[in-house]
């Protein structure tokens, strides 16, 4: 889990646009962020397995 201080710090408007970065909306993780879903890969995998993300299913070929 991300530290609360870092999450709050990131939410404040930055002086320069390049300092902004994406965080997972669920756990606050800054790495492995999936833009299309707005969450990190770990939360994506968890919710996809539970069937909570519409249109996502496990690949099989």
UniProtKB/Swiss-Prot annotation:
SUPFAM superfamilies: Glucocorticoid receptor-like (DNA-binding domain) (SSF57716). Binds 1 zinc ion per subunit. GO terms for biological process: translation. Pfam families: Ribosomal_S14. Coiled coil: none annotated. Zn(2+) binds at residues 24, 27, 40, 43. Disulfide bonds: none annotated. GO terms for cellular component: cytoplasm; small ribosomal subunit. One of its GO terms (molecular function) is rRNA binding. Keywords: Metal-binding, Ribonucleoprotein, Ribosomal protein, RNA-binding, rRNA-binding, Zinc. Binds 16S rRNA, required for the assembly of 30S particles and may also be responsible for determining the conformation of the 16S rRNA at the A site. Part of the 30S ribosomal subunit. Contacts proteins S3 and S10. Belongs to the universal ribosomal protein uS14 family. Zinc-binding uS14 subfamily. This is Small ribosomal subunit protein uS14. It comes from Caldanaerobacter subterraneus subsp. tengcongensis (strain DSM 15242 / JCM 11007 / NBRC 100824 / MB4). The gene is rpsZ.
């Amino acid at each position: 889990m991300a530290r609360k201080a870092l999450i709050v710090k990131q939410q404040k408007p930055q002086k320069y646009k390049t300092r902004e970065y994406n965080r997972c909306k669920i756990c606050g993780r800054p790495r492995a962020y999936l833009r299309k879903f707005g969450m990190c890969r770990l939360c994506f995998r968890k919710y996809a397995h539970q069937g909570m993300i519409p249109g996502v299913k496990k690949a099989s070929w």
